[in-house]
Amino acid sequence: MKEILNKQAAINFDELIEVLRRLRAPDGCPWDREQTSESLVPYLLEETYEIIEAIEDGDIKTLKEELGDLTLHILFQAELAREAGQFEIADSIKHISEKLIRRHPHVFDAQNGNQDSDLNMSWEKAKQKEKKRENLLDGVPKKLPALNRARRIQEKAANV
């Protein structure tokens, strides 16, 4: 069953990319063609907040729809990068898969499996090493809303 679901997800994913490319084509939708990474940021944020609201409300139907909307915006950003010759969505997907494996040695590394008693600290150490950050706070996005930023700083400080 898992393999069938993965195949269907891949088919649906490819279809969505083709729909997006058709919308961006010269004979596609004028609105979609004129969008830039920057012009889409407000919509990206809005979709993210709509997902949060659906989760907090326990509204599964809306969550399903909003996850689709956010997926569109992620693919839209990747399509803009592809059009500019910067990278392909496959590069982003490969990168996140590799990163998850690196940051979960307790799951994927048979020699070191389940050796880390503090998984959060292990994650942060791996992240700091990969990103070559000066300190743990370097990775807290400056654009986060103030309360979210304060929470992330507190979480990171608690691991020191």
Model-derived regions: residue spans:
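Flexible "arm" and connector segments at domain edges
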Residues: 1-66, 72-160
